[in-house]
Amino acid sequence: MLWRGWAMERILLFFAGYLEGGQPGPEQRDLPICIPVATQLPHAVGLAYAAQYRGDDAVVMAYCGDGATSEGDFHEAMNFAGVWHVPMVFLIQNNQWAISVPLKKQTHSRTIAQKALAYGFPGLQVDGNDLLAVYAATREAVERARRGEGPTLIECVTYRLGVHTTSDDPTKYRSTEEVVEGRDRKSTRLNSSHHTTSRMPSSA
């Protein structure tokens, strides 16, 4: 949000529960933050369709979590995006848990990325802890959309270490061993990504 130009005070207001905090400034090309899960996705497809209709080079990006992919709005948005061939990128943060529901109880699909194939456009899975991998996948998806090749879904696989909300107690539904394993896996990948990035200038 900071990178997109949101003022820090607006972000803090949002997390403090003030309505004003979720409103982007008039100069920003963002929509207000949606609290109901997945409701932003059909709106995003509509914006992408409008951009396509106007003939400009805008690409719409919509973000959601793995839990949102179990909502009807997700599938409706995916269907319209595929049918209309809109310039859009669906970016899914798959952190393995939708509050207290694990991914294996949300879907029988091997990946979330493969769901895109049913709607007629590509889906790919990347390591969500690898900044460079996420950047490369997103850049290619945006360029693809600008070439008129339609939408893309990117599944960023990671792990939620903390609580879902301040009223959440994850110890009631997942083991300490699982959290430790998830933490170690994230640390290893983050360190690997950092070392690769650090070597880039000297190896160029």
Tell where the protein language model's regions lie, with residue ranges.
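Acidic, glycine-rich active-site loops and adjacent beta-strand->loop/helix elements
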Residues: 1, 64-70, 92-98, 129-132, ...
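Cofactor-binding active-site loop characterized by glycine-rich and histidine/acidic residues
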Residues: 1-84, 102-108, 113, 118-120
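Conserved thiamine diphosphate
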Residues: 52-56, 109-140, 181-189, 199
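Structural motif
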Residues: 59-63, 89-91, 153-155
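A glycine-rich helix N-cap at a beta->alpha junction
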Residues: 82-92
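Short beta-alpha connecting loops at secondary-structure transitions
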Residues: 97-101, 121-127, 171-180
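Glycine/aspartate-rich loop-and-adjacent alpha/beta segment that forms the canonical ThDP
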Residues: 144-189, 199
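Single conserved hydrophobic/aromatic residue that forms the stacking wall/gate
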Residues: 190-204
